Amino acid sequence: MRERETEVAIVGAGAAGLSLALRLAHPPPGARPLAVTLVEAPAGPLRPPPRTWCWWEPAGGPFDGWLTASWSRLRVRGPDGDTIERGLGGCRYKMLTSADFEARVRERTGAVERREWTVRRVRSRAGGAELLGETAEGQPARLRARWVLDSRPPAAPPPARTRLLQHFHGWFLRTPRPAFDPTVVELMDFRVPQPAEGLAFGYVLPLAEDRALVEYTGFSRRPLDDAGYRRALAHYAGRVLGLGDDHRVEAVERGVIPLTDARHPRRAGPAVFRIGAAGGATRPSTGYTFAAVQRQTAAVADALFAGRAPLPPPAYPARALALDAVLLAALDRGRVRGADVFPRLFREVPIARLLRFLDGRTSPAEDLTVGRRAPALPLLRTVVDLAVRPRRAAPPAAARPAPVPR
């Protein structure tokens, strides 16, 4: 058995694991460098596929030089085609591919030891914790660490009252003539058939006048099958966007993100902590994760360099999560139509306030001003319903989708 020791073990090389490794590779002035080992799964089903991450923040962010694209305007369309377009002021909507992020992080983390192991177990031990698993060649392996930061999905989903999936399937399209406005993101286009419960919308990230990532996204209890996604995307790209059959699919992106009101434990043992989606970084009402991962890993790195236990802070305030729980339950039970709620919010709420709200950074007074734009009676009924509904474990037969941070 291969046995090693380190101060900090990071399990998983997705957005959270890579972000934390990058921060720990560059100690602040006066801080002692830490021995860090990043353990990622060997190539195969346990390693996440290439994917795209999006978020909004002011221009001049730390990853701006790594971006595939960014935009200063967003557009939302209602089911009837009513269009709301908003400038983002000093913010940009940013797109970064996981392949580019990993390549840039690898260039900047030479001091971080990397291991391709399948981790089967993380257990506490005196003075820290240890990872047990096997190498890519199938040899037993053990790594002892003072601290473990684990970004893998838990073995079983935590108890919840509502369980939806944000599932999406996208085509990277090229057209023979200009077909897209590269200055505006089509954030939510509800001109697609809507399910009885949940919602569905189109999503377009224009990379040039003749290139774009075009996605079909649904919020529902179950994803579609491959044929269903092909039909939905063919309808959206061909008929709604007016591209017909005159386009070429150059690549495909797909993913499933659990959206629940579960409470995600951020501590799994005296020296073991969860980060990323496993630590609650996914916003339940939107599926966005990357920006919260950056806040979370920054706090973890600060704690480690200061010699403190690296307990990740809550990714979102309790008040924001309570509001999300109500919205998810109302969507799941068909009490509100997302195709009506989201366009109204973008139409009636100032964009700067709405973006703060979606980030969980608004005050209680601002939350009230946003909430007044939502259908009050269905949401109040849902509040009463949730007050008496306990969180329950997921059914044993329920598939556990691997989170793909968006």
Regions found by a protein language model. Give the residues of each.
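Short hydrophobic core segments
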Residues: 9-11, 39, 142-155, 272-277
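C-terminal helical "tail/cap" subdomain of flavin- and related membrane-associated enzymes
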Residues: 298-406
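FAD-binding beta-loop-beta segment adjacent to the flavin cofactor pocket
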Residues: 193-199, 255-274, 327-350
